[in-house]
Amino acid sequence: ILFISVPSVFAQKIEKETVPGQEPTLVERLTGGKKVIESAEMNFQLFTSANANFIGSDFDGMNFKLNRVRLEIKGNVWKNLSYHYRQSFNKYSDPYSLDNLSSSLELAYVNLKVHDKFGFTIGKQFVNFGGYEYFVNSIKVREFSEFNNLLTCYQAGISGNWQINPDHELCFQIVNNRSGQDNEIYPTGLPDNTREAKVPFMYTVNWNSYYFDRILQLRYAASVGQQTQKRYSYYFTCGNTIEKGPLLTYLDIMYTRQGLDQH
């Protein structure tokens, strides 16, 4: 198994005066009429393997496989405005009807820091579930648990972060509960006694905390989303991690209850 992450970092500050007569952008308004690029970073992530297949004890063949290939671009436009874009080359779908994005586009958001302790994230982003396996960079995970493998990890929406202190963070998030219409999610159709939700949102409260010089790390979250009228999905996800030097162990506890089975 081969894992490669190639970062290409470009960090500098570039300033340009606004062209006379041109409508100023949001960034120019925030920075007093200047275009500022604080930093930019591009990462290429590759996870490949050689696979040998057996049927019982009989050798059935061998092949090389690119399990995950991703391109990531992120950085700071201004000291309080950052961006993050990530695309996967292992999956593709036509743009979904709700968010108008293909599943290959995993992340596309901007983060605005309005105070040292408060910030907002707008765009397609991580759904703020708890758990170590869910939070860690997926390029490092060989095989996801069945629960995480079926979760919809990225959705369009908005979230707010409150950094209570260096060891405690509280996040509030509202995102789409799904990317497409009901007929794309439930191929057999909805039950006769329910109708399509007019506001198919998922609401999440996420608490992240660190203890004992960050040796103990907790990532807990509670989520509720409307699937259809009078049908809801509930998630309670807990991540408990101990990390000290080369030692890392974790216990993820995850529970879901759904009014309609999506999986």
Predicted features along the sequence, with ranges:
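N-terminal regions that are enriched for targeting/export leaders
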Residues: 21-25, 30
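Outer membrane beta-barrel
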Residues: 29-52, 59-180, 208-212
